């Protein structure tokens, strides 16, 4: 029986990946379709991906698959063919190719079975996730942006919206997708007669959100095909104006793809124009925040003087201090409340 999980340390795997001479391509894809046995599907895909030297993050559930991966360039076409042949539901699936990319986005393959490929909190048995809004292609997106009857809804997190979004897009102020869904319905109820255009990074969240809006009585609902990634790619290929402003946050080592030259965010420590996310260098904090080069030098990559001081302690003392602290998901919590609390930022929603 082959080993179907990684047994090598992250540091060693990262060093191996960085030492590779072959270029890589970052690809994301998703598909809502019925998977009868997610665990068996996961194991088969793990072996296939491993044989091709693929790294990345893949989630499977009975409702489908969601993946962000790094593929050796020489194996991209083989990967495409094998994926399309793996299940009829995946044949011809759109693959989103990263815009700004050296392929060094992942260095380990993590493949997990979950209850949902996107945590939505929906437990309404009458909800039909397949009854989605109509797709919009790049030219249609630009036309909708000029339509006074259309409202663009950003279905991403606050830290994604902060560094980039479509012109005049509405942010849904919530910390998770599951919190955004009911809030979007509530916020847009008075605009039920408008054209609702939903978008996210690669399409997976806005597709489900569009179905949820239709389930709640909204009839004029669209979503951007392939999300921001596909929109920007197609707009550039077709010589269209790219109407997304700033940077597209991505969930890998890059933390962002530059879409336009505008920088619309600010360093969370000094307020200078900056849209570069980082994680606090103190392993006991790991806060996701925006930090300019000057503050990165001043605070040694940390979010605060306290974390900077803790990082300077001997490793044993750092581990002792971390013992008993909040662990797991709490340490990696990206909520607006935790960010504001750690950095003393006024909450814009209050």
Curated annotation (Swiss-Prot):
Highest taxon of the lineage: Bacteria
Name the UniProt key words of this record, in alphabetical order. Answer: Oxidoreductase, tRNA processing
Q: Which SMART domains match?
A: RHOD (SM00450)
Q: Can you tell me which residues form the catalytic site?
A: 200
Query: What Gene3D superfamilies does this protein map onto?
Result: 3.30.70.100, Rhodanese-like domain
The segment annotated Disordered runs over 318-350
Q: Which reaction does it catalyse?
A: uridine(34) in tRNA + AH2 + O2 = 5-hydroxyuridine(34) in tRNA + A + H2O
Among InterPro entries, the record links this protein to: Rhodanese-like_dom, Rhodanese-like_dom_sf, Rhodanese_C, TrhO, TRHO_N
Give the enzyme class: oxidoreductase
Q: What is its EC number?
A: 1.14.-.-
Biological process (GO) annotations? tRNA modification
Q: What does this protein do?
A: Catalyzes oxygen-dependent 5-hydroxyuridine (ho5U) modification at position 34 in tRNAs.
This chain belongs to the protein called tRNA uridine(34) hydroxylase
Q: What is the lineage of its organism?
A: Bacteria, Pseudomonadati, Pseudomonadota, Gammaproteobacteria, Enterobacterales
């Amino acid at each position: 029986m082959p080993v179907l999980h990684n047994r090598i340390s992250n540091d060693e795997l990262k060093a191996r990946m960085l030492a590779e001479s072959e270029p890589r391509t970052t690809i994301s894809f998703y598909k809502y379709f019925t998977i009868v046995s997610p665990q068996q599907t996961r194991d088969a895909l793990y072996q296939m991906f491993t044989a091709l030297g693929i790294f990345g993050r893949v989630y499977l559930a009975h409702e489908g698959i969601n993946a962000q991966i790094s593929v050796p360039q020489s194996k991209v076409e083989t990967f495409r063919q094998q994926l399309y042949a793996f299940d009829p539901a995946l044949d011809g699936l759109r693959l989103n190719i990263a815009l700004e990319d050296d392929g060094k986005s992942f260095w380990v393959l993590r493949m997990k079975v979950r209850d949902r490929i996107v945590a939505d909190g929906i437990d309404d048995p009458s909800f039909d996730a397949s009854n989605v809004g109509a797709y919009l292609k790049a030219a249609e997106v630009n036309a909708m942006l000029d339509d006074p009857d259309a409202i663009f809804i950003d279905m991403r997190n606050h830290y994604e919206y902060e560094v980039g979004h479509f012109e005049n897009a509405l942010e849904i102020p919530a910390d998770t997708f599951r919190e955004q869904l009911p809030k979007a319905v509530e916020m847009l109820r008075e605009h039920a007669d408008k054209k609702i255009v939903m978008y996210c990074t690669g399409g997976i969240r806005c597709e489900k959100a569009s179905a949820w809006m239709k389930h709640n009585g909204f009839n004029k609902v669209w979503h951007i095909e392939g999300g921001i990634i596909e929109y920007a790619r197609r707009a550039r290929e077709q010589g269209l104006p790219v109407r997304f402003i700033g940077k597209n946050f991505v969930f890998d080592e890059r933390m962002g793809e530059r879409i336009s030259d505008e920088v619309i965010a600010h360093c969370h420590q000094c307020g200078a124009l900056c849209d570069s996310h980082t994680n606090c260098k103190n392993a006991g904090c790991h806060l996701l925040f925006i930090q300019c080069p000057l503050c990165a030098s001043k605070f040694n990559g940390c979010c605060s003087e306290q974390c900077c001081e803790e990082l300077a302690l001997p490793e044993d003392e750092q581990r002792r201090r971390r013992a008993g602290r909040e662990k797991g998901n709490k340490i990696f919590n990206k909520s607006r409340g935790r960010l504001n609390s750690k950095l003393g930022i006024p909450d814009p929603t209050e």
